[in-house]
Amino acid sequence: MILDNIKNTRSHRRFSNKKPSEQDILKMIEGARFSSSAKNNQGLRFSYTTDDEKCEKLTKGVMLGGLLKKEVKPTPEERPRGFFLISVKKDTKMPDSRVYLDLGIAAQNLCLIAQELGYGTCVILSYNKKVFEEVMELPEEYDSRAVIVFGEPIDQVKLVDAIDDQTNYYVKDGIHHVPKLPLDTLIIK
């Protein structure tokens, strides 16, 4: 059932050294390709790399696990093994609200496919654009909007019920806990 895949598609920040296959990467982008798009604009474009040297440079351009304590943050050996850079043309006529709506839908589809293929992902909006656009050799006419890191996850992620609306994620006993609000608190009556 798709709900199980959604529950299992979590943000991962620690990865093995296994390099993702080109075939699997293209399947992930195919998931994004078939996403719904505001006015069927389909304005998103995807760059990716699994090159070790580039991935090392790109890792320095993101902060993984900003809320986590230093001792449970990923080590350099646990860095992502791949990066997607999602971009739009600078002269797009789409308002940002639609760009980010499309981006969210496409990113979720890409991450769902990645999880199904055995990869973990983490969608990142706070990254060093200059570093990413240079390392990924993004053509001048494009503006990057998001990063998705990926690889074979080595961290364990567990969904737990939020208590008193506390939703900050944390690591306890080596397991990454992600509090989720109860269903009845999400419904406006």
Q: What does each of the following model-derived ranges do?
A:
Residues 1-189:
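Acidic, surface-exposed loops and disordered segments
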